[in-house]
């Protein structure tokens, strides 16, 4: 008997600011805080799954929707961090990621971006990655508030550091 192989997708919901008044002296911490905020109570596991299924049906038709829905599960979602983990079949992973990226509303909440962050074969590794990622974001916010570097220098140094860490993680996998 062949084992059922599944993939886990870590995603985040980003809420871009709707006001057009942008100050020139906005720090990176302010940008991170304005985009990464808690989800409203309307965004629940049930509403996210309904919206994913609706997106699959609209964009892939009956065949794609039926193909992806066979193993589609939302394993975890936190309203405080606006992050979640989806379980899907290995062959349908790309289709589910496409459906996530094409979503622009969940329930009554409109104007959001669903960002697939990482795909993994085990839920343990995706949870570890999510914890490391959240601690990095918190460190970025703390360091940028206390740093005397300009925002551009801080952003460039931070992207170089994250790029080196991602190369090391890819070598470990």
From Swiss-Prot:
The EC number(s) this enzyme carries: 3.1.26.5
Pfam families given in the database record: RNase_P_Rpp14 (PF01900)
Catalysed reaction, written as an equation: Endonucleolytic cleavage of RNA, removing 5'-extranucleotides from tRNA precursor
One of the GO biological process terms: maturation of 5.8S rRNA
Molecular function per GO: ribonuclease MRP activity; ribonuclease P activity; ribonuclease P RNA binding; RNA binding
Compartment(s): Cytoplasm; Nucleus
Main location (coarse class): cytoplasm
Further remark: Present with 2230 molecules/cell in log phase SD medium.
PANTHER family linked to this entry: POP5 HOMOLOG, RIBONUCLEASE P_MRP SUBUNIT
Family that this chain belongs to: Belongs to the eukaryotic/archaeal RNase P protein component 2 family.
Function: Component of ribonuclease P, a protein complex that generates mature tRNA molecules by cleaving their 5'-ends. Also a component of RNase MRP, which cleaves pre-rRNA sequences.
Protein name listed in UniProt: Ribonuclease P/MRP protein subunit POP5
Organism: Saccharomyces cerevisiae (strain ATCC 204508 / S288c) (Baker's yeast)
């Amino acid at each position: 008997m062949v084992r059922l192989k599944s993939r886990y997708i870590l995603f985040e919901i980003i809420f871009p600011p709707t006001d057009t008044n942008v100050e020139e002296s906005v720090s990176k911490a302010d940008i991170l805080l304005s985009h990464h905020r808690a989800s409203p109570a309307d965004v629940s596991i049930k509403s996210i799954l309904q919206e994913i299924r609706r997106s699959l049906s609209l964009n892939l038709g009956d065949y794609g929707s039926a193909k992806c829905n066979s193993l589609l599960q939302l394993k975890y979602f936190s309203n405080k961090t606006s992050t979640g983990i989806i379980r899907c079949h290995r062959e349908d992973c790309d289709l589910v990621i496409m459906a996530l990226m094409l979503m622009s509303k969940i329930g009554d909440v409109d104007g959001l971006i669903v960002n697939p962050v990482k795909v993994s074969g085990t839920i343990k590794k995706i949870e570890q990655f999510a914890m490391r990622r959240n601690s990095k974001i918190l460190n970025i916010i703390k360091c940028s508030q206390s740093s005397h570097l300009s925002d551009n220098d801080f952003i460039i140094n931070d992207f170089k550091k994250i790029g080196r860490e991602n190369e090391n993680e890819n070598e470990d996998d």
